[in-house]
C-alpha cells in the first residue's frame, strides 16, 4: 500500500505561483467534482494570507492520480515562519521547488531549500510562469544549480529533474518549447522521482506529531506521518513527550486528507499523513506509539527566535471602548494558545502582571499574530521590536541577514545612500534586461526594523525586497534603525479640530484629521526637527460677535499619514508604544503626562552619566 503513496513539500518564493499551481493540480486530478465551487488561491485559508498573498501556516492536501495518492504539504516562503518549515520536512520524502521563469531563485527559496537539503531530500525543480514576457528559463536553471552548489548539495541533489509549467494556463512539459495542455508531465515526474515513504507496515504503530490544529467539536487534532504500523479509532496508545515523559491515551477518530477536506477513515496505514483526535495536551514533536513499542522519535529542532516585543494591557484613556478582550488574563490565554501550534513563538511573563515578553522569528511573524488578535477583538499595547542578542565566549553578537533588493535604475543612488546609512555591506550588483537592478547586501537585523516602509517610500512602491537570516557576528555599537525626527504630542484629551491642525501643519507631518478623538500623550504627527514637541490640537477659532471682513484664511488640511500595523511598529522609538484595537492603530508615548516624560528623561540621562 505504502508503495503508492508520495509525500512531497512545495517550496517557493512569495508570488512565484505556488498556490495557483496547487489549484491546477487539485482541479486537473479530478479531486474537485464538477459541482464544487472552484475558488482561486484555494490553499490560502487564512484571511491575512489571502490579503497579503503569502502563506503563513503550512497546510496539507492530498491528490488521487491514477492508483497513486500524492500528499502535498504547502510550506511558508518567509524565513519568519521557519518553525513551520522545519516540521514539514520531517513528514515528506521529496520537495517540489517552484521558481519563477523570469526572477530565478530568491532568498526565501534559499532558506527553505537549505532546510530540505539538511533533511536529505531530493528536489524536483518546477520552472513556473513560463508564459511570462521576457522569461529566461536557461538562465534560471544555471542560477538554481549555483544555489544548490552553494548549499553543499550532494551529487544526487545536483542531478535534478526539471519540469516547465504555466500554472495560470494549466500547461506543463519537460521541454518549454513543447508544452502539453495539462499537468500530466508534472504528475508523472512526481511519481517517478519522489521516492515512496521508507516505512515498515509490519511493526507496531509509531508516528510523530508535526502539526497541531484545533476544532471546537473534535478538540486538539494532531497531524503527522505514520512511521510504522497502522492505527484505528479507539486504539490505545502511549504519548512520549520531548523530555521522555509518558502517558496513556485513546484515539478517538482517525482523519485523512482528500483534496482540502479531512475525512474520517477506519484505518491509517504506514507512510500516510493523517490526523488523530482524542488526545489532549498534545505538543509538536510528541511521539505517539503502541503500548508495546515505547520508542521515541528524535525531537524536531526549531530555529531560535531573533526578535522580541512586549505586549501589555491597553492603559490609554480610550481603553475598553473598541475591543471585547482587554484584560491581562485574556491576552495571556490567547498568547499561550498561540504557542501550542506556533512553535517558533515564545511567551514569558514578566515581573509586571500586565506585561508579557513575546519572541518570534521576525517582525512579520509577530505583526501577523498582532493583526490576528486585533481582528478577534483584542485591545493591547506593544513596544518597538528589539533584536535578541547572543553572548558567545563573552562577546555580544547580533544576527545579520542577506537582503536582495530589486529596484528601478533611477532609484539606485537613493537606495545605496539609504543602506549606507544603515551600515549595509554591498555583496553584488546585477542589471537585468528590463533595466531593473538587483542589489545584494549583508545587513544587521537591527537595521531591518522599519526598513520595508522606508524602502517602499523611496522606490514609490515599485521596489521588491527579500531577506533571509545569514549568521550571528560581533555586535557593532551604533544607533541604526532609530528615528531621526521628533514627534508632535497632544497636550490634552478631546477632539482634534481643523483650525488647530492647520496651524500645526508647518511644524511637521500630521497623523490624523479633523474630528478625531485624541488623548494627552498621543502622538499626532512627525516633527520637522529632532526634538519632541507637545502641542495643542483642540483649540478652535475664537468667535466674536463682530462681522468678519471677508479676510478669513481658507483652512486647507494636507492629507494625513495613516499607518499600517507594520509601519507603526517600525516608526516608534523605545520610549513609545503602539495602541492596537479592532478599529484603530494609535501611537503614544510610554508616559502620557509631560512632567512624567521629563522625569524619565532626566533619570535616563543620570544613568548614562
Curated annotation (Swiss-Prot):
Q: Which reaction does it catalyse?
A: GTP + H2O = GDP + phosphate + H(+)
Could you tell me one molecular function GO term of this UniProt entry?
A: rRNA binding
Positions contributing to GTP binding: 15-20, 128-131
Q: Which PROSITE patterns match?
A: G_TR_1, G_TR_2
Record's keyword annotation contains rRNA-binding: yes
Q: Output a single Gene Ontology CC term carried by this record.
A: cytosol
The protein's location, in the record's own words, is: Cytoplasm
Domain spans labelled tr-type G: 3-198
Q: Which GO terms describe its biological process?
A: ribosomal large subunit assembly
Q: Which UniProt keywords apply?
A: Cytoplasm, GTP-binding, Hydrolase, Nucleotide-binding, Ribosome biogenesis, RNA-binding, rRNA-binding, tRNA-binding
Q: What is its EC number?
A: 3.6.5.-
**Taxonomically, which superkingdom?**
Bacteria
Any idea what job this protein has? A 50S ribosomal subunit assembly protein with GTPase activity, required for 50S subunit assembly at low temperatures, may also play a role in translation. Binds GTP and analogs. Binds the 70S ribosome between the 30S and 50S subunits, in a similar position as ribosome-bound EF-G; it contacts a number of ribosomal proteins, both rRNAs and the A-site tRNA.
Family label? Belongs to the TRAFAC class translation factor GTPase superfamily. Classic translation factor GTPase family. BipA subfamily.
Describe the subunit structure. Answer: Monomer.
HAMAP family given for it? BipA
In Swiss-Prot or TrEMBL terms, this protein is called Large ribosomal subunit assembly factor BipA
